């Protein structure tokens, strides 16, 4: 499974991504409530309500609790790493969602995902 972060969706909305489309067709994409919220704060494609409804209908990643996220930050020394609450939540969710990789276009988030062994490389698929 692949958890696509907000940057992947925004890029796809601007220009269709064939890798994302193939993963969607094969039911291999997970979504996360915080990604949907971030997209809702922006300008998802029209019709807006239909796009958000579609995203909510995708398989959802397991969501780490605030306590789990705090423990995850300390265990992996993610403090002062340049990432925020959504980023660490996506990292933690990728780890607790079985066989899940995180796909991001955010260089800092990808840098943090690599040593955790959860970075998705679309060029390999």
Question: How should these model regions be labeled?
Answer:
Residues 1-31, 40-52, 59:
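Short, well-structured N-terminal submotif of metal-dependent ribonuclease cores
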Residues 6, 54, 76-79:
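Preference for short coil/turn "hinge" residues that link or interrupt alpha-helices
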Residues 9, 36-39, 109-110:
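A generic structural signal for short hydrophobic patches within well-formed alpha-helices
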Residues 12, 18, 61-123:
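Active-site neighborhoods of divalent-metal-dependent phosphate/nucleic-acid chemistry enzymes
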Residues 14, 33-36, 57, 108, ...:
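Short, acidic/turn-prone active-site loops that include or flank metal/cofactor-
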Residues 23-25, 54, 96, 114:
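Short, structurally constrained coil/turn elements
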């Amino acid at each position: 499974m692949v958890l696509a972060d907000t940057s992947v969706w925004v890029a796809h909305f601007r220009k269709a991504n064939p890798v994302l489309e193939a993963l969607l067709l094969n039911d291999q994409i997970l979504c996360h409530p915080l990604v949907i919220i971030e997209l809702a704060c922006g300008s998802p494609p029209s019709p807006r309500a239909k796009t958000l409804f579609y995203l909510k209908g995708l398989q959802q990643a397991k969501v780490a609790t605030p306590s789990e996220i705090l423990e995850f930050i300390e265990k992996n020394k993610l403090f002062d790493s340049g990432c925020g609450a959504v980023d660490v939540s996506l990292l933690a969710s990728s780890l607790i969602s079985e066989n899940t990789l995180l796909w991001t276009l955010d260089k800092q988030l990808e840098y943090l995902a690599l040593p955790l062994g959860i970075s998705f490389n679309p060029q390999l698929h």
